[in-house]
């Protein structure tokens, strides 16, 4: 898995109704923009605010609309291992390519507990697994040695890092050099170009919901070592980060930015789940 894999916004009509038509427009917009995969129900997709019914519908409708054109990754993060397994089973039944899992986020586990959690979870999942490092939201970060331990299972195939810590990301890349097949993906788009230049496999970049071709061009330039093109594109990406993502005064500001921009592009409504209204 490599390239630009947007973390899809979940188009909503209300707190428990999926905007299926908006989702279809969004997926077609992304495919036309040349992205390399689709990632649903992550942070940008408001997963933790959505009912299980709505999460399951999002999996089914995304896979139906995509119809095998791109790999689909499904986030199964939950405080309940039973619900994580159930989402993975639905994803497999619908034709998804893999699942993505951040640590359980209520009782923060220590590193031994974290490794044991995944050593229990991964064998019960029907799809390949990407680990998801999101310390700002789940209160714990995967130590590089923990990533290496968990990845002894070959069904753990990649790592998405949203820490925005370049030194940490390089440390994980270093310990995982024994697995050249292990996909290293970065979340923050502001640092995707430099990460790819240093050997990362791609980005799960929210801005690609709005401007997929921009992020694909950035990835291609970084992959090719085209610094002149990157010097032109990186300021545009930073302008998006420092304007669209600053709507409101809270941690969900970037999400509100997406949901303000996508209606302007004619893609979906601006409904944000009640948990993020303010």
PLM segments and residue spans:
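C-terminal alpha-helical cap/extension of soluble enzyme domains
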Residues: 5-9, 33-35, 200, 211-278
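A general structural signal for well-ordered alpha-helical segments in protein cores
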Residues: 23, 55, 59, 84, ...
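Structural recognition of alpha->loop->beta junctions
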Residues: 93-99, 124-127, 149-158, 269-270
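Short, flexible micro-motifs
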Residues: 6, 40, 45-48, 78, ...
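Active-site beta->alpha loop and helix N-cap motifs at the rims of alpha/beta catalytic domains
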Residues: 1-6, 10-141, 277
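Catalytic alpha/beta core domains of metabolic enzymes, predominantly
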Residues: 123-124, 135-241
């Amino acid at each position: 898995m490599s390239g630009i894999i947007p973390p899809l916004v979940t188009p909503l009509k209300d707190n428990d109704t999926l905007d299926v038509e908006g989702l279809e427009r969004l997926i077609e917009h992304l495919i036309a923009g040349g992205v390399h995969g689709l990632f649903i129900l992550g942070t940008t997709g408001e997963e933790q605010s959505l009912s299980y019914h709505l999460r399951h519908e999002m999996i089914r409708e995304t896979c139906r609309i995509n119809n095998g054109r791109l790999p689909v990754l499904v986030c199964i993060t939950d405080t309940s291992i039973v619900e994580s397994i159930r989402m993975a089973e639905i994803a497999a039944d619908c034709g998804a390519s893999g699942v993505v899992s951040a640590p359980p986020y209520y009782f923060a586990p220590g590193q031994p507990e974290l490794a044991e959690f995944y050593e229990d979870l991964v064998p019960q999942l029907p799809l390949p697994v990407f680990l998801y490092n999101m310390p700002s939201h789940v209160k714990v970060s995967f130590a590089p040695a923990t990533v290496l331990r968990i990845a002894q299972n070959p069904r753990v195939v990649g790592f998405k890092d949203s820490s925005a810590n370049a030194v940490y990301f390089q440390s994980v890349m270093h310990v995982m050099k024994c697995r050249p097949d292990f996909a290293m993906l970065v979340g923050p788009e502001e640092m995707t170009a430099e990460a790819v230049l240093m050997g990362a496999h791609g980005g799960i970049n929210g801005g690609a919901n709005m401007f997929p071709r921009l992020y694909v061009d950035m990835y291609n330039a970084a992959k090719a070592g085209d610094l002149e093109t990157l010097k032109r594109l990186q300021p545009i990406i930073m302008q998006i980060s420092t304007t669209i993502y600053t709507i409101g005064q809270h941690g969900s500001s970037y999400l509100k930015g997406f949901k303000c921009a996508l209606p302007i592009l004619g893609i979906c409504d601006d409904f944000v789940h009640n948990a993020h209204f303010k």
